[in-house]
């Protein structure tokens, strides 16, 4: 089949394009700008156009669009004019999952790392799955793992309810919190989306979910299939944390053994338990599955060490929600040099999220010694009156355990500010889903 993909340069779309091309489809794509993903697609034999023009649709039999594509896109308009079937990214993913035993990883936080851990563990156990991940695995430098066509692991996106298009055989739900205020008016709406997703699982399928999350626990009652629970405080698979990167695994009441991970943090302990739960569903020993993650190299922009110079450690993370930020700052603290400070550099992501969650952001940064806030990364949203990085700064200043706070709206000024306020033994961590990571890279160049 001839497939044209509009907005092919993102992590989700590029992965689907690679899988379709590998499976014999003739794939073309377009995006506004060149990126590592478009370059890799081109190297894989996919024709990628930079920019959007009607003629680039060619003789496609189906057109796939990403959620970022406006209705006025010339290629989309051309496909509509010619009555070429147009499907969203989630539908293309659903069709791939339907070709075999599909495993979808969902949740507000931790989807990318958990998907990667499942793929890593199943590969080590000899299952050889195909995996579509929303980020780049450090071990292979790609967001796609090619393996069996009848076993597929994929990240499921709840941000616009497109998760409801997926009908996997098994699913993981890591946690449920309020996010994506550009689409959901309340937490209840988010919960309802996950509930509908769970209700759609087949009776012969399986659900793995976090018992530490009360909203996840409620979903277990709705599942039409067997359920495996995991957690730190309860669940069939339970962990007792021993250090930032190790824990004792319990299966039911039985102590199984110690596990060491290749990544740090209580959140990654939970992610690894989810991976062990999926492996157990496939007939593997959960302890053996968890222990394979000792060689897990992590995911790009997930507590990624960018370098160390003049005694200053620079780390980058994708965290852009208050809960994620708290978890990452805890890891930074646990792995910091003695007496070293934690300097957080935050780029708020989306005006809608900043407006809804600025108070929660303020409380989250109480774990840092200093916070530098820059301007909001709009991610396609129009600016909103009164919504800027200053909103987060003011919220931090209102907290009782407030750190030093700096408001630097000009991102170009960040590296020099960071050079001036950081010193030996300090950890500087850039946080956000936009382009904040380059501030850390430029800081390293100046130290």
UniProtKB/Swiss-Prot annotation:
Pathway: Cell wall biogenesis; peptidoglycan biosynthesis. This is UDP-N-acetylmuramate--L-alanine ligase. It is found in: Cytoplasm. It comes from Rubrobacter xylanophilus (strain DSM 9941 / JCM 11954 / NBRC 16129 / PRD-1). Transmembrane segments: none annotated. Keywords: ATP-binding, Cell cycle, Cell division, Cell shape, Cell wall biogenesis/degradation, Cytoplasm, Ligase, Nucleotide-binding, Peptidoglycan synthesis. Its EC number is 6.3.2.8. Cell wall formation. The keyword Nucleotide-binding applies. The lineage of its organism: Bacteria, Bacillati, Actinomycetota, Rubrobacteria, Rubrobacterales. Signal peptide: none annotated. InterPro entries: Mur-like_cat_sf, Mur_ligase_C, Mur_ligase_C_dom_sf, Mur_ligase_cen, Mur_ligase_N, MurCDEF_pg_biosynth, UDP-N-AcMur_Ala_ligase_MurC. Pfam families: Mur_ligase, Mur_ligase_C, Mur_ligase_M. ATP binds at residues 107-113. NCBIfam families: murC (TIGR01082). Belongs to the MurCDEF family. It catalyses: UDP-N-acetyl-alpha-D-muramate + L-alanine + ATP = UDP-N-acetyl-alpha-D-muramoyl-L-alanine + ADP + phosphate + H(+). Gene3D superfamilies: Mur ligase, C-terminal domain (3.90.190.20), Mur-like, catalytic domain (3.40.1190.10), NAD(P)-binding Rossmann-like Domain (3.40.50.720). GO terms for biological process: cell division; cell wall organization; peptidoglycan biosynthetic process; regulation of cell shape. It is an enzyme of class 6 (ligase). One of its GO terms (molecular function) is UDP-N-acetylmuramate-L-alanine ligase activity. The keyword Ligase applies.
């Amino acid at each position: 089949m001839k497939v044209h993909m509009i907005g092919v340069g993102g992590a989700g779309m590029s992965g689907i394009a690679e899988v379709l091309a590998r499976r014999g489809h003739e794939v073309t794509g377009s995006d506004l700008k060149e990126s590592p993903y478009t370059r890799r697609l081109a190297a894989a034999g996919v024709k990628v156009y930079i920019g959007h023009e009607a003629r680039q649709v060619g003789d496609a039999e189906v057109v796939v669009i990403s959620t970022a594509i406006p209705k006025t896109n010339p290629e989309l308009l051309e496909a509509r004019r010619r009555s070429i079937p147009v499907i969203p990214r989630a539908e293309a993913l659903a069709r791939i999952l339907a070709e075999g035993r599909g495993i979808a990883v969902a949740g507000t936080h931790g989807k990318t790392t958990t998907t990667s851990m499942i793929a890593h563990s199943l590969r080590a156990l000899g299952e050889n799955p195909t995996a579509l991940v929303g980020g780049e695995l450090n071990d292979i430098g790609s967001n796609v793992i090619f393996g069996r066509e009848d076993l597929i692991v994929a990240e499921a996106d709840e941000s616009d309810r497109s998760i409801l298009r997926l009908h996997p055989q098994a699913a993981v739900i890591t946690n449920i919190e309020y996010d994506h205020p550009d689409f959901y008016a309340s937490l209840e709406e988010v919960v309802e989306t996950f509930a509908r997703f769970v209700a759609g699982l087949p009776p012969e399928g399986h659900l793995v979910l976090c018992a530490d999350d009360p909203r996840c626990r409620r979903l277990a009652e709705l599942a039409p299939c067997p359920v495996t629970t995991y957690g730190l405080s309860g669940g069939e698979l339970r962990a007792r944390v021993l250090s930032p990167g190790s824990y004792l695994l319990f299966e039911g009441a039985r102590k199984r053994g110690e596990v060491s991970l290749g990544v740090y943090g209580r959140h990654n302990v939970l992610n690894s338990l989810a991976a062990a739960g999926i492996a157990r569903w496939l007939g593997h020993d959960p302890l053996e599955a968890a222990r394979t993650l000792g060689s897990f190299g992590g995911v790009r922009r997930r507590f990624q060490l960018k370098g160390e110079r003049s005694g200053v450690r620079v780390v980058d993370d994708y965290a852009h929600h208050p809960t994620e930020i708290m978890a990452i700052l805890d890891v930074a603290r646990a792995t910091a040099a003695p007496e070293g400070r934690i300097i957080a550099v935050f780029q708020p992501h989306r005006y809608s999220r900043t407006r809804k969650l600025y108070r929660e952001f303020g409380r989250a940064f109480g774990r840092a010694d200093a916070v530098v806030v820059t301007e909001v990364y709009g991610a396609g949203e129009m600016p909103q009156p009164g919504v800027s990085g200053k909103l987060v700064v003011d919220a931090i200043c209102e907290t009782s355990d407030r750190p030093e706070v700096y408001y630097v709206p000009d991102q170009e000024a960040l590296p020099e500010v960071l050079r001036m306020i950081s010193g030996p033994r300090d950890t500087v961590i850039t946080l956000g889903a936009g382009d904040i990571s380059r501030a850390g890279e430029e800081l390293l160049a100046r130290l």
